[in-house]
Curated annotation (Swiss-Prot):
Signal peptide: none annotated. The chain crosses the membrane at residues 8-28. InterPro entries: CcmE (IPR004329), CcmE-like_sf (IPR036127), NA-bd_OB-fold (IPR012340). Belongs to the CcmE/CycJ family. Residues 140-162 are annotated as: Disordered. It comes from Nitrobacter winogradskyi (strain ATCC 25391 / DSM 10237 / CIP 104748 / NCIMB 11846 / Nb-255). Residues 29-162 are periplasmic. This is Cytochrome c-type biogenesis protein CcmE. GO terms for molecular function: heme binding; metal ion binding. The gene is ccmE.
Amino acid sequence: MTRKQRRLTMIGGALVVLGIAAALVLNALRDSIVFFSTPMMVSEKHIQPGQRFRLGGLVQTGSLVRGDNLAVSFRVSDGSATLPVSYKGILPDLFREGQGVVAEGALDNSGVFQADTVLAKHDETYMPKEVADALKKQGHWKDDYGAQPGAAEASSKQEVSQ
């Protein structure tokens, strides 16, 4: 083999190894990505039990039930559909009925969302952008849910431009 052929063989081999490594990394990341879904999206997508995802919406008023050993159940609604949620752990201090929530976990075989992480709104105007957008899209947005997503950002841009 000439020098040029050896160099091309080495470059080709390196590219193949790099391609395989990239494919493995992308495959691993694809499996660990958690998507955000509203209860309506969950019912439309027919998400399989055990598949991890994030569930966002409002905690339905009157649905919070506290059990033994930090077990809690409640329903998450997006105005069109509701989904029962079961969680075992300490809820955030700002967790309330009628407030925005994002829970991470998976559906069990009975259709109950088994959450292992629950996030609640952190001040009087916060709502996850995805939840607010979903509520607006479905026509269920109410102005008393808090500041519209991006409102603080828009007002700061106005102050800068003046």
